[in-house]
């Protein structure tokens, strides 16, 4: 059965992270899940999932930690990553309330799990697209959407008082086919994480919401793995140039709010078809690296919103 879950009552089982006790986990379809608000977080927390999360050092939002919220309250800044539609707009209001006036800003990072390819090498009726669509549909049915809606996010930020909201879309290779060394390595690492995530991400949602059996989910995940493993899946992109002159793409062009996080600028305002380069400067030490945006992509969307003097004035008037 898809919902044969029972809390574990014996010794701590194999595969459970060492910092977990048996009261904190329950078994369902061969994986271990957390009992806190049981059923809300539908992804496993067993050892294999946390092993995959260790790949976060390559600066790709990991699938296990993607739905968790991390806060850093430092110098009036808030840094967080999560699936915000699950949490609701009240969190935006709390973030806004705690930001330092005239200085604080908020940055949100998401992965768009809709795979895409412009040259048709990724079949729209293929297994990867089927997996992504079924997963997003299932999560929608539970009221826990992972489908991105940039316009809704911007509107919610504006509703609580943020202005100068800027969205940056970074395209990410799904596998290691690119010829450029750095981009190929990036694609290989992301490919490793994605292939390990197909089954755990979709097991509970598809079994609970779509009536799939564990065997059917395993079969779909295996076919999706085979599809993304092939470097014959190729595509291209044209990375949009910014409205500002060549150089840094200012996060808040009409204010004096500093931007200590990473900044990006377009290496060429008219990139050649099929490839373009984005240089990134680390705000801590000034090191630069180049990421070529080519290939079959998942899309990371980063939205930055600032508290400007105008926004603070609106907040004071409302108070």
Swiss-Prot record:
Keywords: Methyltransferase, Nucleus, S-adenosyl-L-methionine, Sporulation, Transcription, Transcription regulation, Transferase, Virulence. Signal peptide: none annotated. It is found in: Nucleus. One of its GO terms (molecular function) is methyltransferase activity. Induction: Expression is regulated by the developmental and secondary metabolism regulator veA. GO terms for biological process: methylation; sporulation resulting in formation of a cellular spore. It catalyses: L-methionyl-[protein] + S-adenosyl-L-methionine = S-methyl-L-methionyl-[protein] + S-adenosyl-L-homocysteine. It is an enzyme of class 2 (transferase). One of its GO terms (cellular component) is nucleus. Residues 269-293 are annotated as: Disordered. Its EC number is 2.1.1.-. Residues 270-293 have a biased composition (Polar residues). Disruption phenotype: Abolishes the production of chaetoglobosin A. Increases the expression of velB. Leads to reduced amounts of spores. Component of the heterotrimeric velvet complex composed of laeA, veA and velB; VeA acting as a bridging protein between laeA and velB. Methyltransferase; component of the velvet transcription factor complex that acts as a global regulator for secondary metabolite gene expression. Controls the expression of the chaetoglobosin A biosynthesis cluster via the cheR transcription factor and the subsequent production of chaetoglobosin A. Positively regulates the expression of smtA and negatively regulates the expression of velB. LaeA also regulates pigmentation and spores production. Belongs to the methyltransferase superfamily. LaeA methyltransferase family. This is Protein-methionine methyltransferase laeA. It comes from Chaetomium globosum (strain ATCC 6205 / CBS 148.51 / DSM 1962 / NBRC 6347 / NRRL 1970). The lineage of its organism: Eukaryota, Fungi, Dikarya, Ascomycota, Pezizomycotina.
């Amino acid at each position: 059965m898809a919902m044969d879950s029972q809390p574990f009552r014996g010794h701590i089982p194999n595969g459970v992270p060492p910092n977990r006790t048996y009261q904190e986990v329950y078994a369902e379809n061969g994986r271990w899940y957390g009992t806190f608000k049981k059923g809300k977080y539908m992804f496993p927390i067993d050892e294999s999932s946390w092993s995959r999360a260790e790949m976060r050092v390559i600066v790709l939002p990991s699938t296990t930690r993607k739905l968790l919220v991390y806060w850093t309250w430092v110098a009036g800044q808030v840094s967080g990553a999560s699936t915000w539609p699950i949490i609701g707009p009240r969190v935006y209001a709390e973030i806004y309330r705690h930001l330092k006036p005239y200085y604080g800003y908020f940055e949100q990072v998401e992965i768009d799990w809709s795979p895409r390819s412009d040259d048709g090498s990724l079949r729209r009726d293929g297994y990867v697209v089927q997996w992504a669509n079924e997963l997003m549909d299932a999560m929608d049915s539970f009221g826990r959407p992972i489908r991105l809606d940039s316009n809704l996010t911007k509107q919610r930020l504006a509703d609580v008082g943020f202005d100068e909201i800027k969205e940056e879309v970074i395209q990410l290779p799904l596998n290691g086919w690119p010829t450029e060394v750095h981009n190929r390595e990036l694609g290989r690492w992301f490919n490793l994480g994605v292939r390990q995530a197909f089954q755990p991400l979709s097991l509970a949602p598809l079994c609970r919401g779509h009536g799939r059996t564990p065997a059917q989910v395993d079969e779909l995940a295996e076919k999706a793995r085979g599809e993304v493993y092939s470097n014959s899946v190729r595509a291209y992109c044209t990375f949009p140039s910014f409205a500002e002159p060549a150089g840094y793409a200012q996060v808040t062009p009409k204010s004096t709010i500093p931007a200590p996080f990473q900044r990006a600028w377009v290496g060429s305002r008219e990139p050649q078809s099929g490839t373009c380069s984005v240089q990134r400067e680390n705000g801590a030490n000034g090191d630069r690296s180049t990421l070529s945006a080519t290939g079959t992509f998942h899309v990371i969307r980063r939205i930055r919103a600032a508290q400007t003097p105008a926004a603070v004035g609106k907040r004071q008037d409302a108070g």
